Amino acid sequence: MLLLHWDNMGKIELHHVFVMLSCIYLIFSDISINSAVVFLFSSIFFYISFTAGKRLYYLIGIDKENLKINLKKHYNFGIFLMIVGLIAVTSDLIWVKDVPLFNPLSRKFLNVYFTTLSHLFLVGWAIVVASSNIDKKKILLYTIIFSILIMLLGYRTNVLVLLISVGAILYYKNKISNREILKYGILVFVILLGLSILRLYALGVEGNPITSRISLTMSIYDIIFNNFNGVFNGYIHYSAVFSYLGLCNGARTVIAKTLGIYNVSITPTIVGAVIGDYGTLAIIPYFGILGIFLGFFYKLAKDVKGIYLGIYGILFAYTLIGIESGILDIDVILYYFFGLILCIYAILLRKLKR
C-alpha cells in the first residue's frame, strides 16, 4: 500500500531531497543550537528559492521549439567526453601504479589533472543517457559496469555522482516511476555503505561508516560557525579554483590545516564553506541564487532534454553531495557555470526571436 501511495505522488524534485538530507545530517550530529538553526534555515531557503526559480521559468516563457535541439549532436558530444574520461582514468591508474580502491593510501599519489579529466566520463554518460532512447535496463547495466570502472580510483563521490545523475535523468525522462526511484535510491545507499565499509577495512579503522562521517563533517561545520565565521574572507573558494594552478592548497586542505589537522582534507559542508568565507548572512544570497538557478534549469532541462537534462542530472548529484563536501572543486564549479550558460542561451534566444 505504501508503494502504491508513493507512485501516486507528484515528482520528487531536488529541493525536496536537499531538505530531507539536510535534516538527516542534523539528526545524526551533535552541534550547537545556533549552528543547527542556520544549517536548517539554509536548506529551507534553498527550497523556497528553487520554487521561485521554477516560477521564473514560466514567467519568462521559454519556447523549446526555438532552441532547435539536435539530440544526435548532443549524443556524439557525450560519447566524446566519455572517451576523454576513459583515457584519463586509465592514465591515472598507470600513473599511480596501484588500485586506490584496495589501497586508499595510494590515492594521494593520483595525478590531479588526470583525476579531474576522469570526471568527464560521468558528464559524458549523463549526456548520452539524456540524449538517447537506450533501453532502461541496458542503461542501468552499463551504469553498474561504469561504476565499477570509476570506483577503481577510490573516490566514492564519483560513483555516487554517476549513480545519482543517471537515476535523476531516467526519472525526469519518465522512464522510471516513483516506486522505482525509491528502490533505486535504496540500491545507491547500499553501494555507498559497501564502499564505505571497504574503505574502513582497507585503512584498518573501526566505526560506523555512515553516521561517523556525518558526525565528523557536522562537527567541522560547527567549529567553523562558532570560531571561524567570516574569517577566511573568500580564501576557501579562492583555493577551490587556484589550487589547480598550483598557487595554493586545495580548499578542504586549507580548512584542515587551519584546524591543526595535517596530511588529510576535511569536508566543511556547503553551509560551512560559505559561512567560513563570507559570514552567516552570506547564506541568503548564496542559497538564493543557487536555488533560483537550479529551479529554472530544472524546468528547462525537463522540457528540452538532451545536454540540458544531462548537465542538470550532474548538478542534481553534486548539489546533494555538496551538502557534505561543499561545492569546492574547479571542475564542479565549471559544470554549474556551463548550466548557467545554457539557461542564459535559452533566455537570450527567446528575446532574439521576438
Swiss-Prot record:
Gene Ontology cellular-component terms listed: plasma membrane
Keyword tags: Cell membrane, Membrane, Transmembrane, Transmembrane helix
Pfam families reported in the protein's UniProt record: O_anti_polymase (PF01901)
TM ranges: 9-29, 31-51, 76-96, 109-129, 144-164, 185-205, 278-298, 306-326, 327-347
Principal subcellular localization: membrane
Subcellular location: Cell membrane
Annotated membrane topology: Multi-pass membrane protein
InterPro entries: O_anti_polymase (IPR002760)
Superkingdom to which the source organism belongs: Archaea
Name of this chain's protein: Uncharacterized protein MJ0419
Protein species of origin: Methanocaldococcus jannaschii (strain ATCC 43067 / DSM 2661 / JAL-1 / JCM 10045 / NBRC 100440) (Methanococcus jannaschii)
